[in-house]
Amino acid sequence: MTHPNRTTPRPATVVRCALLVSALVAGAAACGSGGGHPLASRPYDATGQVVFAGLPGDGRKADPDKPLEITVKDSEGPLTDVTAVDATGRFVAGELAADGRRWHSTEPLAANAHYTVRVSTEDDDGAPGRRVLTFDTGAPVSKKRLEVTFGPDAGTYGVGQPITATLSRPVKDPAQRAVVERALKVDSTPSVPGAWHWVDSKELHYRPKDYWPAQARIRVHSHLDGIKIGDRLWGAKTPDLNLKIGDKVVAVTDASSHWMTVYKNGEEINSIPVTTGKPGFETRNGVKVVLGKEYNVRMRGTTVGISAGSSESYDLSVYYATRVTWSGEYVHAAPWSVDSQGSANVSHGCTGMSTGNAAWFYENVREGDVVKVINSYGDDMEPFGNGFGDWNVTWKKWQEGSALTTKKGPQGDTSRLQPTMV
């Protein structure tokens, strides 16, 4: 492509302001105040200067398995910026070569997507050029899909409720995990810092650095639909999940003093005499989260490894049972131990209280509320697998469980990553 008044290239004076993400998003191309500077002119049509490799030119859909590559013709001026975005607002990450003559995508294109690509160039005088291209990608050849199920169910929860993402297939490769995690978004109002943590190859948990703010609203959504995750594996569509957070309710049980103190939005609202696990059956220390409530539960010692007929054997009908672990730890009514409540630990691991106090607790907590045990001789609460012990993991360790974390620290949201010079 020929432009009038070309002179010998002046690479030392080339101004490259199009790499500013804010300028791209706003559609602005100026980084000066005009006054005759070449960049103050209207961008020329760079159609003859830019080559899109791998895109069919006959109206056929592009193969989502192939990367997007953009180059400039020989003797033409360099690329200064490239953005590629689909109809849902997902940006494609890419790299711009140091000499400005080639840009290529560094993450897969989505299948069945409509893309708009905006290319910025300049001529030898530094005058800006622009080309815009749209194209569609076709369906993936493979039928293998990765489905994601978000949890918990829609509803209102306590400030300790983690978000879960359960995968239909195991994902073990670190690069594939990064693709999956980058596509799973959690937005909250008010906004708070948070991160995903890979529990295993099929489950991720998300939590904020601290508990959710009281009365927060949370939206969980996936951009994985149509995204290539690995060889012959593509993301499937996932419904959004919307949650509400209620009041901040935290119950702290001191096993050494045999009392539970309940706080609501930072204010003490009740103090309850309790009994916790006796020697050999000590209650777990640490932060737990309410998993559910059952008005009546049959509790048998055989379900926790106590032999039938032994001196520790029991078979009881228990009321106002608030579950905090899957292995059978509850806060519940224990009328048979009222004389010990507030003075001794005589249970098999549960937190027992009078029927009246248990009914009050049952009515004033919800799933996701925090139940913390301190000063027990029991083991520490497991982070995963026995309820939600997520809050017993330090924030630093939690971030290390993200696939987007490097030795330099956790990466930010890269869904809008712009091209970088290499």
Residue ranges and their predicted role:
Residues 159, 285, 297, 301-422:
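Exported/periplasmic cell-wall-interacting domains
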Residues 229-339:
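Gly/Pro-biased beta-strand-loop elements
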Residues 2-28, 32-247, 274, 412-415:
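Acidic, low-complexity Ser/Thr/Gly/Pro-rich repeat segments typical of extracellular/periplasmic
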